[in-house]
Every structure is written in C-alpha cells, then in structure tokens.
C-alpha cells in the first residue's frame, strides 16, 4: 500500500563540513581528509568560507535551453508498476469490447494492483473463497472492519481481475487451436483505465510526443457522441500515468478496431487446418506459454492468394477451433482479430450470449497482453526557454500550487508533497527540468579563462580556483587530468536549471566516480544518499519490490529514470541520509554512492565528476560490473592506468602508489588471460595502438568493454573483436584464423611497473634518510643545510604530507627559532628593542633546547657566553641592593648595564623600582614647589596615577597622601566652578568673585576656575558696554540692543541690566509687529521698511517688475537698511542723515514714476486689434503680454495688466455702502481707480491710525529704522494733505465741488421718489404713468433715456445683480463738469504724488472724483471691472450681509462719540472697495477684514487724540533725536486744519 504524505519521515542529515581558509585552499586534499567520515554516508555537504562568493558568469540573455518533461507519478518504481498493471488490465477489457471502470470503496478508488497482489499472496482466489478470508484481504488493504467490505472486494475481484488473471495463467488456452498471426500490429497504444484525479491537469502542449496527448486528438471514427451522452462514461474520461509517461484516456467501445486489424489481416491456414488440425494443436500446445506471443508468423503473399482463390472452401471451414464442429452456427462467435470461430459454450469461461461490438478470441487477447512494454525514458519539451522565462514559469507554478509566495513555502512541506505525488496514481503532475545542459555550449556558471573576454582580477581569482568545477577535474591530484578527451558531464561540467518537484532519480556516477555539485543561486535542492557499502542492498531491494520493471530492463538503475521512497528503502534496512543544499554550497557524492533528489524551486546548479587516487580500485571494480551488465564504458580504465604509468614522475606520490597497485593487478590479470589464449592455440599476434581507434571499433562484442591492453580478432570476421575474457564468443572460425591484438608486450608491462615502483618507493628512501637524521642513529648531527635539502626534496618531488615530513619541518622551525633568539642576544641593543628580552629561565631553556636538537648549531657557544655575563651581573646587583644608602647614579648605571645584556634579570626589576621611586618623588617636589609654575589638574592626576603604580615605601606613601589631599580640594573647587558655569540658575558677579578669590590659594591650575574668571571679565565688559550705550546722545538702536542681549544671555552670570534690555527689545519687536500688520498685506513679499521708504526703482519698469516676480516666487532677497536709504551703518544712527536720505528718495521716486509713465504711455494699447509683441509692449506680472478684453491700465505707472492676475477694485463697494447711498448713475463716484501691485505695495492705512503708532513709538527708548521711516512717511503725507486741502479750498475747485454736490442731491431725490417701487418685484410690470411724479431729468446725465425707464432700472439695480448695471453703461455720458486746464493740471500732479504715498487720505479720493467728473466715463474699464466682478458677485451676497452687520455695530459706536474709530471704519470701507481685487472666497475677505480690525484696535487702545500727539514734551526727547515735534515742525497745524465744508461723501 502506498503511504500518505503525512507518513513521510525525513531521513537523518548527512555530514556537513565548514572548512577554514587554510583547509579550503586545496580541494582534493580536503576531500581526502574528510573521506573517512563522509564516505560512510555516501554524500556530504560543504559550506565554503563566507567570503568565497564566485560571480555568476553565464550570459543570461543568450542562455537558451530546452528542458525535459517529468511526470512525477511515473518516476516512482512501485507507482509505475501499479500504472503498468492498470494499463494491462484496461487493455485486456478494452480488447474484449468492455470499458474498465475502477470502483470506489469507502470513498476511495480501489487499488486493483494491491488487491491482486494480496489475493495471490493469500493463496489465490479459490483458496480465499474456500477459507472465507476476504475480510482479511480487506484488512490488509486498510479498510475498516465490520462493514462487509470483504464481500464487496470479492465481487469486484470476480468481475474485473479474475478474468484477467485466468488469461494471464493461460487457463483458457488449453484446447485452443492457435495459428500464426501478424505480430506487428499498428495499434501499440496503451488502453484507457478510469483513475479519478484530485486535480484536473490537462497535459501541456509539449507532451505531443506522448500517447496521452494523442488520445486528446480525435480518432478517425470517433465515438465521442456516446461518451458525452453517457454520464458514467463522461466521469471516466480522465488521465493517468503509464510506463512511458503516457496517460490513458477512457474511450468508448472502438468500432474501428476491426478496420484497423483488417489492414494487416491474418490469414488462417485454412487448408492446413482442415488436413491436420490436431497436429497444429499439438504444435501450439507444445510451445511454452510465455512464447505464445512470439511463435506466430505473418501471412505471406502466397497465403493471401490461397485464401482468395479458395474463398468458397474458407466459408465452409467456419468451425469451432476448440471442438472442431460447425453445428449450432447461431452460437458460433467470430474473432475480430484473427477471424477464428468459437462456440460461446466452448470458451473458458463460457459466454451466456453473443457479445455486442468488438470481440477477440483468447489467443489474440493473450498475444496482445503478453507484448513487452517499451523502455521508459524522458521526453524533451518543445518550448525553448531563457532563464527569465523559465524562472517566471517555475515561480508561477509553485505559487499557484501552494497558494502562497514561493519564498514562504517551507522545505518540509515541499518534501512531503513531492513524495506524496510520486506515490499517487490519482494525481498526474507534470514539471520540467533543464538537466544535463553542456557548459561547453552554453557557458559555465563559473568564470573561465578564455581569449574571448578579459576577466577582472576578482574573476581571475575564481577562474583559477580549485573549487571551480571547470578546474577540479583536471587538477594534478585528479586522475581525469590524464584523459585527453573532454568527456561531457565528467571533465566538462553540466548545468541544471530546476523548478519545484523536478527530480533526479536514484543513480551512481559513471565509472563509480566522485561527483561535486555547486548551487549557484535559487531555492534549495534536496538530496538523498546511500553509502557504497549499501549499493548492492539498494539494488536488491528495488528489484525485489518491483521485479516487473527489472525483468524487462535489467540496467534500469543506470537510466536515471526510477525513484523509490527513502522510507521504503529504510524500512528494508538500506541506510539513507538527506540534506538541503542551499545557494553557495557544495554537495559531494562518493564512489558507488547512490543518490537522488529534487528541487525545492527555481534554481541553477552545476555539476562535474572527478577521480582521486583512492578511486582507482573502485574504478576497476566498476569495469567488472559493467562487463557483467554488458554496459558501454565512457573511457578505457586500462588505457588510463597505462597512460599514467608512462610518465610516473608527473604523478602525485599518492597517485603513483595507487597506480602502482592497480598496474600490478592489471599485469597479473593480463598474464593469466594471455596464457589462456596460448593454451587455446592462438599464437598469432600483432601490435595495435588502441588509443588511436574510435571507441566503437575496439569494444568487445560480448560485454561492450573498451579494449586497450589486448583483444582477440579474426581474420575472417574483421568487423568485431572480443576481450580476452570472452575469447569463446568471437566467432565459430578456427583458432588458427584468430589472432591477438595487443598494445604492450608482456616484457614492456613490467618495465612500466618498475618505473612506477621507483616513483612510489622514492618516498621510502627519502623517509629513511629523514628518520636517520632526526633520530641521530649514526651518532652524527646533521647541519641545518642538510635538513633543508631533505625538505626541499620532499617539496620538489611532491611527497605526501606525512608525519615524518611534519617532524622534519618542526625541527627546522625550532632550529630557526633558536638561531633567531641567539641573533637577538648577540646583536646590538637597537635590534633587541623590536623583541622582548629573554628571562634567565628562558635563556637556560634555550641552551638546553639547542643542545637537544638533532641539528648541529655553532651558535651554542654564544649562548653560553651570555649566560656567564648574566650570572656575574646578578652578583653585582645584589651587592648594590644590600647597601643601606645606594646612590641613584650607581643604580642607574647598573640598570643600563642590565639592559645591554638583553636578558631579563630579577635583580634588574628591583633596581628599576628604586630608580622609579626616586624619579617620582623628584617630580612631585618640582610640581608643588612655590616658585614653580602651577601645574594643571591633569598633570597632578597623572602624578597620582603614576605613584600608585610604583613600589611602596614610606617616602612614597607620604607624598602620595599629600598629593591626594591636594587633588581632592582642587576637584571640589573645580566642581563648584563647573556648577556655576553650567547651572540653570545664574549667580551674580559678587558670588563668582568670592569663589575665584578663594580658589587662588590652591597651587594647581584649575580650568573651570579660569573659565569662571573669563566669564566674569566678559560680564564686566558687557555691563560697561550697556552703560555706554544707555548714556549716549541718542537712544540705542534695536540692532545694538539685540546684540547685547544675545551676548548677555550666553554669559553664565546673572545680570540685572539684561532684563531691562530684553524688555526694551521685546517692546520694540511688538511695535514692529503691529506696524507690519497695519501696513503689510497678507503674505506680502515686501518688508515693512521697504513699504515705508520711497521706491528706489520706481523709474525702472523691467527691474521693478523682475524684483516683484522674484519676490512672489520667494527668490528675491529683501534689501537691507543701508541699501534702501543708501546710507552706511554709521549714518543710520544719525537721525538727520536719515531724514535727508528720505527726502532724496522722495524726489527720485517722483522722477522715476514720471519717466515710467512716459515710457508706458508710449506703449501700444492692448485693446487695439493690431497690437503685437515687441520690446516696447507691456508685460503683465505673469510674464505674458496683456491683450484683448479683461486688461486694465494702472492709473499710476500707466502699464497694462491682466485683470485676472491682479487685485481690482469693486465698482460698487463705495457707491452703495447703505440704502441711503448715492445713486448708481453717479458714475464719477464709482470706484474704478486701479493701482497695480507694483505701485500699491501695502494696505495703505489711514493717517489717524498711523498717528497712534507714532505715539507708541515715542514711548520706546529704542531706535528702529522702521520708526524713523514711518515718521518721514507721516510728515510726507501731512505735507501732501495740506497742499491737497489748499487746492480743494480754492474758489474754482469749490465751485466744481458744489456742482457735483448738486448733481448728487438731485439723483438722491429721484431715488427717494422711487422707494415705493423697491418692494415691487423686478419682473412685475410698471404702473402706467409711474413717471408723472418724478423730478425732471438732469441734463446731460442720461440723454437718451426717459425718466421712467431710468428710474425703473435704478430701482431694479438696487435690488438685483450687476447685469442691470451693465445695461446702463450705454446710457452713461459725460463729462458732467467743465474742468479747466489750469485747474486740472495741478490736481493731476497732486493725484500723482498722493498715489505714491503708502497712506490713505480722503483728499486723494476727492481729487479723483473731480478728475473723473471732468472727463468722459471710461466705459472700457467699467466693462472690464464688471466682467471681473461677475464670477464672485453671487458668493459676495452672503459675505456682504456679515460685513454689513459689522458696519452697523461700528455705526453704533460712532453714535456713542467714538469719532476716531469711525474714521478707521470709513477707511476700511474705502480700502475694502479699492483693494479687494479678485479674491472671490469668503474666507479671504473675512480674514482681511479681521486684520484691518486689528490695525484699528492699535489706534483705539492708544486712547489718544490729535492734541495728545501735538503736546509731546520736547524735553522728554533727547537732543537731535527722531521725535515727531523735533523732526516734523509742520505736523501740528496740518493735523488741526478742518476739512472743506463740501463733503461729497
């Protein structure tokens, strides 16, 4: 019975060796060393040193191979026997017209082979039925008892197996008259049997060579219709394994069998049978049963003609071939194979009725079943693979089979599954194996030295390594190096590309040689090995368990196609070991060691054979084994021995000894065989150079052995020859016609043997000389040169590494060591410094060693002389040590004398101790002397450490204690100083001064105390700097204070002034932050100082634009204070210089902007259709040329921009602040003023807010560049405001303002009259005569529209979207004022200067309205602004409600009297209208509003009015400081000047 997968028990592990680098250098020597251990297991594994990693040298892209196909369950011997049995019994029933259906018993298919075998072992069918032992049969088949399974097995046996067994025994052929029939039928297919599969695996495309694939193809006359309609037959349409790796598919009854047989129809011998029927019966019955199938002969043409011409007689001869009667013709049955007839009741067993379909007679069935099976072998796949494609296929197969990643499948699981699959007849798993790939053709995995490619140094190292499989077979110690031919697989490595389950079957190597396998990479390879001592036992077990296979193929184990479960072998006493070979490991198999295995997954291995000296006896035995099996040899063993014997000096000594032994045996055998030849009477002979003949021309025709020393040939039969062991099998010719062909005469062979003996015995001669020299047997010591000559002879003649050679080398090494020590003694002191001196004991041992060496050494006298000097020195030193007060000088002189001896004398140590004590005491006195320079703490600690190492004495102990006490005190003060330097809580200077003062009394240099001194000095210097800067003429600059704060924080001293400075710096930073929030936009690319100072590059358009783009991209470095004002760092500290520089910057800014306006005005308008890009064309901030609709022109620099790239004003932001706002048709009040981001760099807060910042600035005792720039900006704004108010107060301008006010009031009145219409929906029709009560239309305002329609539109605009406002654009006209040239030009200049200010002033807006009213409305700009405002208009309704609520709260605050806050809110409203731009998201506008509220709070929290700003005490500001009243005398009157009465807003 086959064992389950869980029953597999892994055999024990084989030996594993891990050589050192020294052992790894010589591979064959190491293998010889481990052979006694490893040979007992048959195989072993070797792990090279970790850093031995040869590169993979195969050209992966060009490597292509065709693998073999392996069907796993056809590999195992016992499984193959079962499959063969199923094939035969399936064919038996199919021949009779029945289909085999294997039954299921207890939910598993019935093992018919095991059932048949057990029944046979139990005595046969009749005996079992008689004794009623079917229950025992069921028990042996592992079926449970008590279920009446025995009766079921009996019925299956009777129905399926028993008829087949009867045919096999020939019981039904007792009285059958058989006739010759054609033995060469075309139908040699294995017939189907029904074996259910666990996995339905269709044969792959490469199996078209097999019969399994052929069965998938349609037959000439298919019967598929019956199979498809019959569910039972459909279930049996499955595939199993056969003896030639060919599955058998279940088929319906084959109606074409008769037709197929008719093609080679057998002609019954009708005439002969009629005349002598009984004689033919006797002839056939006299033949052996097993020869029945071979006794028939095919019909000849004459027989066919005879049958044709006597067709009438042939019909009359339809008689039963058993009873020879023709009656009861309705019971006669015609054979479809041979056309013989039988009564159905004459057959054994008799048939109840005429069977339907094809029927064959018993002799045809016997002939078909007795046909011998074809030899089993592997097929080649049809698909060619590369390494990559094969690896992808292999990994995919393994991952799909185990349903997990390939690297996660345990090796134990793969091993159990492999042995389950090969033992299963139910599952048919097919894999591919790239085996026996020639490295000569495809390239080796190891680097190989060749002229095709130059190797790197690393590759060259591995190319010459003995472990390179291309090098190992041809090493000097290897036998195969003496074979000239490149034997593939033996001398030339083979490559193996494996996948999971791909296997190599049980086998031994050719000629029983060694083999070595190296796994280059990939998943492990599992090996099983059997030692050579159990090789015959393994063969016997396999033959005993599967005799059916070995009967037809006696050399089955030599074909590498058969496996057997290691557990089965072990259960029969065969010792088996296993191992998993991982990447980078070697596996070695020993001579005649059977081995097999399989691959765990995708991998790449390389293998080759090699033969050492110990293999020669096994090689000779292998030739005898091959001779018995009549197997061909790979090479001639005799030729190999003779070739090595011809050049004995080139042989390794161990190899020479082994060859001599083999040569001696071979010569003795040759003498015996040639003597037998002479006794037979063969005397003719001729010399033949067998090595020049092809192997197939010198093979023995009997045993297939390759001849070399001699062979027997015949003059009359020149085509063949035999070896001398088969001289009787050559031919039948007379002995006189036979002659001997020989290679060497019997006299030449002993001469070759003698040369080998000399080479083999040369070691004995040399060994005798060495033994005499080492043991001084003749009483004479050899010189060192003589011993060296003996060692050189062993090395040159390659003697083995024996114990005697090792003794010789050890003796030479000892002599060399003694000579080296003697040279150290007698040489100068400089040479002795390199080595440690000898002790007195070692000197005496050296003298004794030199005397005992078997080598004569003349240096022994020098050693004796040194020993005498040492003994005399000992006496003198003892006398000096014994005196009471030895002088230091005497002891030092004796010490130097002892050092010159080169010997370590014990008295010298005592002298050394006393000298060291005196030297150490002297060093301590010098270090602690008052006049000496203070030593460092490290020096004192070093003295203490040195004192602990010297020998103890009263003086030394006292000095050591004093030094220890001093160090303890010093370390305590060092710790205090360290605590002061590192502690988080800093100490005041007075504390530090006290610590330093006390530490001055310690006579040691203390590093931490010195650091504390330095820190205190720095602190005092810092205090002086603070006093100096605080008492100067001006307030200190913020940069100076920050530097002082940074320095003060790093000092380990508590400084009271530091807290004051930190507070001042913090206050200054807070003021700067508030100013930045007030002026700078969100995410502005400008600094506060850049915004407050005049634009230095206002006149350069390209420079200005480039810098702006760089700042937007965060590539621009902000200008420093000195760059902005053009002043040095020293001038910045002078307020007067800052004011002058600011004034100059104003003038440059104005001149630059005028130049820029002229330049930009000359550029073509983007709105013109003919505008083309040129050097004079405007460039937007996005870097592109603005063109077409959606472009805006800056009112300051006159340059053009895309409306989507810049922030644009909201046209109705100031026109409709409330329901009582000015009407829509007052277009001159619309906020259409556009300043580009290059001109409007900040938020431009209102002047009142800035004044609050200035008040906070006066309270700071710190000077900031931004503060002085803000003062200059404020003065500039106030000066401009005064000029603007003066211009607005002139008579002409006042008149114009009155006209605008009148127009505005008129439009407001009209709007109030339309208020009843506000509640009317925009889509409702207007009442008739609704315009009767309306005031008269203002002339020139809407000339083409009547009042009714205009009022309707005005009312609808107030409650609708901007589309209504867009519809009014065509009705606008102007100008509404007549603005004279004399009035307009001054206003435009003021407008220009006001736009340059980064401050919001109401006068600026009034001047803008006057200039707008004095010119026609800019419809193109208005259209552009409306178009840009539309996308965000819907989303702004909700935001408008929230902002309106805030404005109402602000209005309530105004009503309570908070005028300053009201001004700020108005400023925010106007600024909101101008600077809202393209921000369409509600969050952005609300954030901006909150930031502006923060700016307002700065002003509100100050709680000051204008009068408080004017009442600054000049005495509180230092002389020439940057105060408001000191620097800006014009500030006071301008702040209190009232606004004009004509307030348009």
UniProtKB/Swiss-Prot annotation:
Family matches, as SUPFAM superfamilies: ARID-like, Clavaminate synthase-like, FYVE/PHD zinc finger
GO BP annotation list: chromatin remodeling; regulation of DNA-templated transcription
Species of origin: Canis lupus familiaris
Comp. bias regions, Polar residues: 199-210
Residues reported to bind 2-oxoglutarate: 433, 515, 517, 525
Protein residues bound to Fe cation: 507, 509, 595
Cell location: Nucleus
Required co-factors: L-ascorbate; Fe(2+)
Modified residues (Phosphoserine): 295, 310, 883, 887, 1350
Reaction it catalyzes: N(6),N(6),N(6)-trimethyl-L-lysyl(4)-[histone H3] + 3 2-oxoglutarate + 3 O2 = L-lysyl(4)-[histone H3] + 3 formaldehyde + 3 succinate + 3 CO2
Recorded superkingdom: Eukaryota
Biased amino acid composition, Acidic residues: 1483-1494
GO molecular function: DNA binding; histone H3K4me/H3K4me2/H3K4me3 demethylase activity; zinc ion binding
Name this protein carries in UniProt: Lysine-specific demethylase 5D
GO terms under cellular component: chromatin; nucleus
């Amino acid at each position: 019975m086959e064992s389950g997968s869980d029953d597999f028990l892994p055999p024990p592990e084989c030996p594993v060796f891990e050589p050192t680098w020294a052992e790894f250098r010589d591979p064959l020597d190491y293998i010889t060393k481990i052979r006694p251990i490893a040979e007992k297991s048959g195989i072993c594994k070797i792990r090279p040193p970790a850093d031995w990693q040869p590169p993979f040298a195969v050209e992966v892209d060009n490597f292509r191979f065709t693998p073999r196909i392996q069907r796993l369950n056809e590999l195992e011997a016992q499984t193959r026997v079962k499959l063969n049995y199923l094939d035969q019994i399936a064919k038996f029933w199919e021949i009779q017209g029945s289909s085999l259906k294997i039954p299921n018993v207890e939910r598993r298919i019935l093992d018919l082979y095991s059932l048949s075998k057990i029944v046979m072992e139990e005595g046969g069918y009749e005996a079992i039925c008689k004794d009623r032992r079917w229950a025992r049969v069921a028990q042996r088949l592992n079926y449970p008892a008590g279920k009446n399974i025995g009766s079921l097995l009996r019925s299956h046996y009777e129905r399926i197996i028993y008829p087949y067994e009867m045919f096999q025994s020939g019981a039904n052929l007792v009285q059958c008259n058989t006739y010759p029939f054609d033995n060469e039928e075309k139908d040699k297919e294995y017939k189907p049997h029904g074996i259910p599969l666990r996995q339905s695996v269709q044969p792959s495309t490469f199996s078209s060579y097999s019969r399994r694939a052929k069965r998938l193809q349609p037959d000439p006359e298919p019967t598929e219709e019956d199979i498809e309609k019959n569910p039972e037959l459909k279930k049996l349409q499955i595939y199993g394994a056969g003896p030639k790796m060919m599955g058998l598919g279940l088929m319906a009854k084959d109606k074409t069998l008769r037709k197929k047989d008719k093609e080679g129809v057998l002609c019954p011998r009708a005439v002969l049978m009629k005349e002598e029927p009984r004689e033919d019966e006797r002839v056939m019955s006299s033949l052996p049963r097993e020869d029945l199938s071979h006794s028939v002969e095919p019909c000849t043409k004459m027989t066919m003609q005879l049958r044709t011409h006597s067709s009438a007689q042939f019909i009359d001869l339809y008689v039963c071939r058993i009873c020879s009667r023709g009656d009861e013709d309705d019971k006669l049955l015609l054979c479809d194979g041979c056309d013989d007839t039988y009564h159905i009741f004459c057959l054994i067993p008799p048939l109840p009725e005429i069977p339907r379909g094809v029927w064959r007679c018993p002799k045809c069935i016997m002939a078909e079943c007795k046909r011998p099976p074809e030899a089993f072998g592997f097929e080649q796949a049809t698909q060619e693979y590369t390494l990559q494609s094969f690896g992808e296929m292999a990994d995919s197969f393994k991952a799909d089979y185990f349903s997990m990643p390939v690297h996660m499948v345990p090796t134990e699981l793969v091993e159990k599954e492999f042995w389950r699959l090969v033992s299963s007849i139910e599952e048919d798993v097919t894999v591919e194996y790239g085996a026996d790939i020639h490295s000569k053709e495809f390239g080796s995995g190891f680097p190989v030295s060749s002229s095709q490619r130059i190797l790197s140094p690393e590759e060259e190292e591995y190319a010459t390594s003995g472990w390179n499989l291309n090098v190992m077979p041809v090493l000097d110690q290897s036998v195969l190096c003496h074979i000239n031919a490149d034997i593939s697989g033996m001398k030339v490595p083979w490559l193996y590309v494996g996948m999971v389950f791909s296997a190599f079957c049980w086998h031994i190597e050719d000629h029983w040689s060694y083999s070595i396998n190296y796994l280059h990479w990939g998943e492990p390879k599992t090996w099983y090995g059997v030692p050579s001592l159990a090789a015959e036992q393994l063969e016997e077990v396999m033959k005993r368990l599967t005799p059916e296979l070995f009967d037809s193929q006696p050399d089955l184990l030599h074909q590498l196609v058969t496996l057997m479960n290691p557990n089965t072998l072990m259960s029969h006493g065969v010792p088996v070991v296993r191992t998993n070979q991982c990447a980078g490991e070697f596996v070695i198999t020993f001579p005649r060691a059977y081995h097999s295995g399989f691959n765990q997954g995708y991998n790449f291995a390389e293998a080759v054979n090699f033969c050492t000296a110990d293999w020669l006896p096994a090689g000779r035995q292998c030739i005898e084994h091959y001779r018995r099996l009549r197997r061909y040899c790979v090479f001639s063993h005799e030729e190999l021995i003779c070739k090595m014997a011809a050049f004995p000096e080139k042989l390794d000594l161990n190899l020479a000894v082994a060859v001599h032994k083999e040569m001696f045996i071979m010569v003795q055998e040759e003498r015996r065989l040639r003597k037998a030849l002479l006794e037979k009477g063969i005397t003719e002979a001729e010399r033949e150079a067998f090595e020049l003949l092809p192997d197939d021309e010198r093979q023995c025709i009997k045993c297939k052995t390759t001849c070399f020393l001699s062979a027997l040939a015949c003059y009359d039969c020149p085509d063949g020859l035999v070896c001398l062991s088969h001289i009787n099998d050559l031919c039948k010719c007379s002995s006189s016609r036979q002659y001997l062909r020989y290679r060497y005469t019997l006299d030449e062979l002993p001469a070759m043997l003698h040369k080998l003996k000399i080479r083999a015995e040369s070691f004995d001669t040399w060994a005798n000389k060495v033994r005499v020299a080492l043991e001084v047997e003749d009483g004479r010591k050899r010189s060192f040169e003589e011993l060296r000559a003996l060692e050189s002879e062993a090395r040159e003649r390659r003697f083995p590494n024996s114990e005697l050679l090792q003794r010789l080398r050890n003796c030479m090494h000892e002599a060399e060591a003694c000579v080296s020590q003697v040279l150290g003694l007698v040489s100068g002191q400089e040479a002795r410094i390199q080595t440690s001196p000898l002790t007195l004991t070692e000197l005496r041992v050296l003298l004794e060693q030199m005397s005992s060496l078997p080598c004569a050494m003349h240096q022994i006298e020098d050693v004796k002389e040194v020993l005498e000097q040492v003994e005399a020195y000992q006496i003198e030193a003892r006398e000096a040590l014994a005196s009471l007060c030895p002088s230091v000088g005497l002891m030092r002189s004796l010490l130097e004398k002892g050092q010159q001896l080169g010997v370590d004398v014990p008295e010298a140590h005592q002298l050394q101790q006393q000298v060291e004590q005196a030297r150490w005491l002297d060093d301590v006195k010098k270090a602690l002397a008052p006049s000496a320079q203070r030593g460092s703490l490290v020096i004192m600690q070093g003295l203490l450490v040195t004192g602990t190492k010297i020998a103890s004495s009263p003086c030394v102990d006292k000095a050591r204690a004093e030094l220890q006490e001093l160090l303890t005190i010093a370390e305590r003060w060092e710790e205090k100083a360290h605590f002061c330097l590192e502690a988080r809580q800093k100490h005041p200077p007075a504390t530090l001064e006290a610590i330093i003062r006390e530490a001055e009394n310690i006579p040691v240099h203390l590093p931490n105390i010195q650091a504390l001194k330095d820190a205190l000095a720095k602190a005092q210097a810092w205090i002086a700097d603070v006093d100096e800067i605080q008492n100067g003429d001006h307030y200190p600059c913020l940069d100076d204070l920050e530097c002082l704060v940074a320095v003060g924080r790093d000092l380990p001293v508590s400084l009271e002034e530091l807290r004051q400075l930190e507070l001042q710096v913090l206050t200054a930073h807070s003021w700067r932050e508030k100013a930045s929030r007030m002026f700078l936009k969100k995410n502005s690319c400008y600094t506060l100082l850049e915004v407050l100072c005049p634009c230095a590059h206002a006149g350069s358009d390209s420079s200005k634009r480039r810098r702006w783009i760089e700042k937007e991209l965060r590539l621009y470095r902000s200008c420093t204070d000195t760059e902005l004002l053009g002043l040095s760092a020293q001038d910045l500290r002078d307020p007067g210089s800052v004011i002058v520089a600011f004034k100059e910057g104003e003038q440059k800014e104005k001149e630059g902007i005028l130049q820029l306006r002229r330049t930009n005005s000359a550029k073509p308008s983007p709105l013109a259709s003919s505008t083309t890009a040129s050097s004079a064309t405007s460039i937007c901030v996005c870097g592109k040329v603005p063109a077409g609709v959606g472009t805006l022109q800056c009112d300051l620099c006159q340059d053009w921009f895309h409306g989507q790239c810049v922030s644009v004003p909201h046209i109705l932001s100031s026109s409709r602040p409330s329901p009582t706002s000015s009407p829509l048709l007052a277009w001159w009040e619309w906020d259409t003023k556009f300043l580009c981001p290059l001109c409007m760099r900040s938020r431009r807060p209102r002047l009142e807010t800035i004044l609050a910042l200035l008040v906070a600035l006066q309270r700071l005792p710190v000077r900031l560049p931004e503060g002085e720039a803000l003062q200059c900006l404020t003065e500039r704004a106030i000066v401009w405001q005064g000029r603007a108010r003066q211009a607005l107060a002139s008579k002409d301008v006042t008149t114009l303002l009155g006209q605008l006010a009148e127009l505005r009031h008129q439009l407001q009145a009209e709007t109030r009259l339309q208020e009843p219409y506000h509640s009317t929906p925009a889509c409702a029709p207007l009442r008739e005569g609704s315009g009767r009560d309306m005031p008269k239309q203002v002339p020139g305002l809407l000339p083409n529209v009547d009042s009714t329609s205009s009022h309707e539109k005005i009312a609808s605009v107030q409650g609708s979207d901007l589309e209504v406002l867009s519809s009014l654009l065509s009705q606008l006209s102007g100008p509404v004022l007549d603005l004279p040239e004399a009035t307009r030009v001054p206003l435009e200049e003021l407008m220009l200067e006001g736009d340059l200010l980064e401050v919001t002033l109401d006068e600026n807006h009034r001047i803008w309205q006057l200039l707008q009213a004095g010119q026609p409305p800019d419809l193109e700009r208005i259209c552009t602004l409306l178009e840009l405002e539309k996308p965000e208009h819907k989303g702004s309704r909700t935001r408008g409600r929230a902002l309106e609520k805030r404005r109402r709260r602000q209005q309530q605050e105004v009503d309570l009297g908070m005028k300053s806050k009201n001004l700020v809110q108005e400023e925010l409203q106007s600024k909101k209208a101008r600077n809202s731009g393209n921000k369409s998201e509600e969050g952005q506008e609300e954030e901006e509003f909150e930031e502006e509220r923060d700016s307002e709070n700065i002003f509100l929290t100050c709680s000051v009015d204008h009068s408080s700003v004017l009442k600054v005490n000049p005495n509180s500001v230092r002389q020439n400081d940057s105060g408001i009243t000191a620097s800006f005398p014009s500030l006071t009157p301008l702040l209190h000047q009232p606004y004009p009465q004509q307030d348009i807003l």
